[in-house]
Amino acid sequence: MDKVKISIIIPVYNAEGTLDRCLHSVLDQDFTSYEIILVDDGSTDASSLICDRYSSTDPRFITLHQPNKGVSAARNAGLNMANGEYVMFLDSDDALLPYALDNMVDGIGDEDIVVGGYGVFIDGVPGKEVKPAASKSYKGNDYQLFFQENILRNCEMLDSPWAKLFKRKAVGNIRFDETLSYAEDKLFVFEMLCRSSSVLTIPHAVYGYYMRAGSLGSDISSDAHITKIRQFLPKYIALLDTLCTRFPSVPKIQTLYHKDVVGRYLCRILNIFACRRSDLLNEEFLSWVYSLMDADRHLGIFSLRIGQVPNILLYKLRKLPFSIKAYGFMSKCSCSKK
């Protein structure tokens, strides 16, 4: 096989109903300098046979069968096998949009990362698109402008590794964290951003993210989900701290801490605690939550480090809902001044 431009890594687990659509979306691309690495992660349906069928008829398809280890292990196995100059991740229940690969490689120089957009499909019906505002290369001293111009505008673009190209040499030894089962793909993206020095953005939706109506379910309010968030957050915060240290003149990175760590994850936990009883709710857990809020420079009351004590007292007095409402009010007031 000639040297390929892109290695497309597809983890597969019990995807017999969507895998053909996924693979045909790649075969329908005009751009053809790619290999497709199918990592069958212990499927118990017909997915294994589908993978073998494609790899037996097209040399660009490579199939690896392994015992079920999870999506991160499957992606890592694909990374270890990749030969392309760039690697790309595609989930087996999603699809590439028409001309996706052409749009991704058009205008590419030697950037470490290419960031495209995605379209959401709910029960097959096209919905919103999330994509960069313009085609722009951020290199050298301009790399920090990527964060200034993009990190808040559409921060959802950085939640997942798909709709992106990663230079394989830049990836190096970076791998998905196999100890986590929540947001490990987000950590991969931010670790790449921490170690990279150039990004190309393209203003096109290149990836189709397929969802079913109501597929989010009720798991996001379970104690198990809260535990997963607690395992993920310290690693995410460490990466944000690295970016803050590397780019001290980009305040929007700290704003992301305010909006994402505090406004998204911590307030979700507190609101769950305010609505129902939980075995996780204790003084130690709240001390951890409020210590992270204390680190939020956007709220003066927490920069004075008085966030923990009164809220722990409110917890003991069974006044946690009041505490959460007070924090939410202060947070909105703070954001309105920025």
For the regions a protein language model found, what residue spans apply to each?
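Short aromatic/hydrophobic "clamp" motif used to bind/position activated sugar donors
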Residues: 87
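Donor-binding/catalytic cores of nucleotide-activated saccharide
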Residues: 71, 92-200, 207-227, 248
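Catalytic core of nucleotide-sugar-dependent glycosyltransferases
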Residues: 204-213, 219-248, 267-296
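N-proximal low-complexity "stem/linker" segments adjacent to membrane-targeting elements
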Residues: 1-27
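Membrane-interface aromatic/basic loop that binds lipid-linked glycans or pyrophosphate carriers
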Residues: 271-338
